[in-house]
Swiss-Prot record:
Keywords attached to this entry: Iron, NAD, Oxidoreductase
Single annotated GO MF: 1,3-propanediol dehydrogenase activity
Tagged with keyword Iron: yes
Name under which the protein is recorded: 1,3-propanediol dehydrogenase
């Protein structure tokens, strides 16, 4: 392969493994935090002795005062950020602790941006638009999927236009990420399935991205291998600690990969489904992934053949194209095995919206690193294939 200059961004400090949550208080201390805004959702806050309660325990044990904002919604909205910012300012917080999956992490990043930048958040959509440092962010992760705890991406929904927008900046990187698989035990099967397919999409899109490099390739390949071997088990038995730990590790690797290699049309298209229909992000990715993969296959069949082998397919004696086709079959079979809906029509999507969603998908920042350049008609056709 040809080598070029590339950068590689991850949070300053990353903790992984059982009981990793125990470091959250001391890490906030080391970052100079006196009063934390804990950003989460009402469902997580209601769980007795769950991730929120454990985080509160270790923060208070370290002498950190805490104000709680639990108004985060799925596909976090600009209004969630506005409400969280009001708490951050009213309580005079100086550090942000996010607890949950991608929605609390993205909302927390949005609060940090809004606290340090003037004007509407939408004006910062794009790459490296932020000019000021954010408050320190400590991200406590509870799902194996979005990997927002280790990325520079902040994905929010404009409630007026119902369009998701992405603010990509190294300033969004949490100061500390915490992945404790014990916090993931007992998550519902449907959530595990959706977030797991989100992680697979991250790994696949990073691996075939135009911006891939040797380091992101290594992370993405191991993530694909781990997901293929562990996602079914994690869905089947949520208390399977080995499967949970492997999925948490896979999600972390996939996040490190796409944080630097970027993504592609699956995410660009899924963002339209999330913005317009409030569809769970992992489900949108899972439905679209096989169809976008088929579209992208001719751009890099060698890497799709690699994906097939990483997912356990026997490609001995096959041509590169035939081996690449097996990757699509393996992705589809995994999605079906774990109960992911297979058609957009079953999720309330309207065909009449495809032209608009195709237009907006090509404007999404994730579209620019897709390995095959498409037009609105081709993107609309992929939506129809998934319908």
């Amino acid at each position: 392969m040809s080598y070029r200059m590339f950068d590689y961004l991850v949070p300053n400090v990353n903790f992984f493994g059982p009981n990793a949550i125990s470091v959250v208080g001391e890490r906030c201390q080391l970052l100079g935090g006196k009063k934390a805004l804990l950003v989460t959702d009402k469902g997580l806050r209601a769980i007795k002795d769950g991730a929120v309660d454990k985080t509160l325990h270790y923060l208070r044990e370290a002498g950190i005062e805490v104000a709680i904002f639990d108004g985060v919604e799925p596909n976090p909205k600009d209004t969630n950020v506005r409400d969280g910012l009001a708490v951050f300012r009213r309580e005079q917080c100086d550090i942000i602790v996010t607890v949950g999956g991608g929605s609390p992490h993205d909302c927390g990043k949005g609060i940090g941006i809004a606290a340090t930048h003037e004007g509407d958040l939408y004006q910062y959509a794009g790459i490296e638009t932020l000019t000021n440092p954010l408050p320190p962010i400590v991200a406590v992760n509870t799902t194996a999927g979005t990997a927002s705890e280790v990325t520079r991406h902040c994905v929010l929904t404009n409630t007026e236009t119902k369009v998701k927008f992405v603010i990509v900046s190294w300033r969004n990187l949490p100061s500390v990420s915490i992945n404790d698989p014990l916090l993931m035990i007992g998550k519902p099967a449907a959530l595990t399935a959706a977030t797991g397919m989100d992680a697979l999409t991250h790994a696949v899109e990073a691996y075939i991205s135009k911006d891939a490099n040797p380091v992101t390739d290594a992370a993405a390949m191991q993530a694909i291998r781990l997901i293929a071997r562990n996602l079914r088990q994690a869905v089947a038995l949520g208390s399977n600690l080995q499967a949970r730990e492997n999925m948490a590790y896979a999600s972390l690797l996939a996040g490190m990969a796409f944080n630097n290699a970027n993504l592609g049309y699956v995410h660009a298209m899924a963002h339209q489904l999330g913005g317009l229909y409030d569809m769970p992000h992992g489900v949108a990715n899972a439905v679209l992934l096989p169809h976008v993969a088929r579209y992208n296959l001719i751009a890099n069949p060698e890497k799709f053949a690699d994906i097939a082998e990483l997912m356990g397919e026997n490609i001995t004696g096959l041509s590169t194209l035939d081996a690449a086709e097996k990757a699509i079959a393996a992705i589809t079979r995994l999605s079906m095995d774990i109960g992911i809906p297979q058609h957009l029509r079953d999720l309330g999507v309207k065909e009449a919206d495809f032209p608009y969603m195709a237009e907006m998908a090509l404007k999404d920042g994730n579209a620019f690193s897709n390995p095959r350049k498409g037009n609105e008609q081709e993107i609309a056709a992929i939506f129809r294939q998934a319908f």
